[in-house]
Structure formats: C-alpha cells, structure tokens
Amino acid sequence: MKNRWKILAFGVFFVAISGICFAQVGPATMKAGTYTWVAGGMGGGWYTVAGGFARLVNQKEPRINIKVIPGGGVSNPIQLSQGEADIAWGVGYVDKAAYNGLGPIYDKPYKNIASIAGTLAVDYYHFLAAKDQGITTLDQFVAKVKRGEKIRIAAPMTGTSEYVMTSFVLQYYGISYDKIKQNGGTVIQAIYGDMPSLFEDRHVDYAFTCVGLPAAIVTEMSIARSAILLELSDEIINYCAKTYGTVELSSGLCKVPGGTYAGMPNDIQTLCHSTEILVSPKMPDDVVYVITKILCENKDFLVQLGAGYKVFDPKKAGLTVQVPLHPGALKYYKEVGYIK
C-alpha cells in the first residue's frame, strides 16, 4: 500500500514538474526577471491590454514578470530611452519622431528605443464636417480657409499626438490653425468628451479627432447633427506615411468602412496611425524573443482584449515598425520566415 502511494505521489510530482517545463517558452539558460511596461492612462485601452498580455506572458513563461504602469504616447519613448521602463506602448509616427528628434513633439532624439512589432492596432483621423457646410473632402476645407472663410472648428488639445499630426496635415496644404484664427474663425481646443456638445449646439461646424472604430464621440455627433467625414487624397496620405511614419495607403487600412456612422454609407479614405510595442535595446535577447513569440502566436487572445487588434498581422509585424527592431524580435521573425 505504501509503495502504491509512493508511486502515486511520484506520478503527481512528475506531472507537476512536466507542467512547469512545458510552461517555459524560453531557453533553460534564460534568467528570471521583472520588467516594467509603461502603457496608457489607468483604465484605458492601452493599460488594460498591456495588463492582460502581461498575464499571458507570465502564464506561458513564469520567469518573465511584467509590471504595468500608466503612461502616454508622447512620454513613453522618453521614459523608455531614459531607462525608466523596459517595455512601452507606442504610436508609430510618434516613435519615429522621438527617435529622430522631430519637433515640435521632441526637442532632441531619443535613440535608446527599439521595437518588437508594428501595426497591432490602428487609429483613424476623423475630419468631421457638418453636412450644411457643403463639402466632402479635406481639399475643399482647405480651399475655404484659403478663401478667408470663417471656419469654426473643435481641435485636439495641445500636447497630444493628434494635435501635432493634424497640424502637419494643415501645414502640408499651406494653412494652419493660426490661419483659421487670422481669418476671424474659431479654433476651440477641446477634450473629446466636450466635442459632441460643441458640434450639436453649433458652436463649431468641424471636429478633428483621432480614435479607433467605431468612435463613440463621432457616432454621437453624427446622430445629433447631420455630418460627413471629409475624404483625404492619396497624395496627403502617402506624404504623411513617407515623412512621418503614418500607415501607408498600400496597406488597405486607410479607410473608414461605409456604415460605420449614421448617414455615411460609403467607404471614406482617411489618414491613420498604428500602434507598436517598444522595448529597451538593453533587454535580454532571449526575453524579447519569448515576448515576441507569445505575441505573434496569440492573436486571438489580443482580439479578445480589444477588437481593434484584428488588423494585427504577425507576418508583417516586423516589417511595419518605425524604429529599429530589437535583435531578439528579429531572431523570432527570421526563425519563422517572416523576415528573410
């Protein structure tokens, strides 16, 4: 009887040990460590997804512990570069600006950053206009400004990445938010939560935002007042992709599908930027390899955390980053044949 219990106990012990071994994705020589992931605001999408993915990584590789802390798209590359974090969410074009020291976002380059995957999710620039303004394209909006018409617009807040990008777009056309003001128009910089009431109550006739699809605030505005998203030309989308690192037109992602919002039955071409995951170049190659592997082999899990991650394509993830790939990530992509 005692021998039977010994055999049973040994069997349980063996299964337990086997389970631990199977749980390890990384090589036996990989050292255990705790890493800090700077995400977005607490309770927001970035923060929530980072927390969920951190738990998945730890389940599959117990030697990797990830602590998630609040952050933001503009500040994350700085914190990463200065050694205050090991992993960070990033906005593709913002990361490129940080790496190159592009003003007005950054006053110097932050080179101590790397990436493991690009285009995890996409946010869309919504150039919304009231239908009574009689236009359907951004080119027509620009023409109004150049004619000196008094435009009333709700714009993103200074300091946000979307304020910078919409400013770059206007600059491409030779106009600016200041030009709108000089014409006697109104530029109200507002948080997104305030834009619907400004639009509905006719304090503004236009609203510029950058959000995922479908955007609740745009839905609210388009229901409260007949509206249209202004279509952007191939030229401006290609220019921003080449110059700043926004999503390329050839990706097929630069459109808001018809039916997303009330009164807009057709696809509307627009500018969009992508999300990527950054890491410190100092992170061990084997740790980054494991994180990249878990990320690329668990897309369904990401989509459960957020529907916006449906656009994530592991086969292209290593090719759409805006800063250099970490060697550990590159090793994974080469191993599976995604990068030759």
Where are these regions (language model features)?
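Pocket-flanking alpha-helical
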Residues: V49-L56, K67-K108, G193-L198, L213-S222
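Bilobed "Venus flytrap"/periplasmic-binding protein-like clamshell domains
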Residues: A32-K60, I64-K67, Y125, A129-D201, ...
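Short, solvent-exposed loop/turn segments at the edges of secondary structure
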Residues: L120-Y124, G148, L271-C272
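Signal peptide-directed extracytoplasmic domains
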Residues: Y93, A98-D123, L128-L138
